[in-house]
Structure formats: structure tokens, C-alpha cells
């Protein structure tokens, strides 16, 4: 189900940090 797929920011900063994008995206330091 689509709503079970984590958003990019959630995947970065939530369940799997750094998996989908740089960790700087979590702190707006990119």
C-alpha cells in the first residue's frame, strides 16, 4: 500500500538514516 512506503525525508532521518539521501538533509546543512 502506498501509504506504507516511507517518504524520502522519513527514510533519511527516521527509520534508515542516510539510506536515501545525505544526513545533511536532516539538518538543512547540505
From Swiss-Prot:
Keywords, in A-Z order: Disulfide bond, Glycoprotein, Hydroxylation, Ion channel impairing toxin, Neurotoxin, Presynaptic neurotoxin, Secreted, Toxin, Voltage-gated sodium channel impairing toxin
Keyword Glycoprotein in annotation: yes
Modified residue annotations for 4-hydroxyproline: 2, 17, 22
Tissue-specific expression: Expressed by the venom duct.
UniProt PTM comment: O-glycosylated at Ser-7 by a core type 9 glycan, containing both D- and L-galactose units (alpha-L-Galp-(1->4)-alpha-D- GlcpNAc-(1->6)-[alpha-L-Galp-(1->2)-bets-D-Galp-(1->3)-]alpha-D-GalpNAc-(1->O)).
GO molecular function: sodium channel regulator activity; toxin activity
Residues annotated as glycosylated: 7
Note: Found in both injectable (milked) (IV) and dissected venom (DV).
Name of the protein in its database record: Conotoxin CcTx
Source species: Conus consors (Singed cone)
Amino acid at each position: 500500500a502506498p501509504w506504507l512506503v516511507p517518504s524520502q525525508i522519513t527514510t533519511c532521518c527516521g527509520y534508515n538514516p542516510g539510506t536515501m539521501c545525505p544526513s545533511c538533509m536532516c539538518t538543512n546543512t547540505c
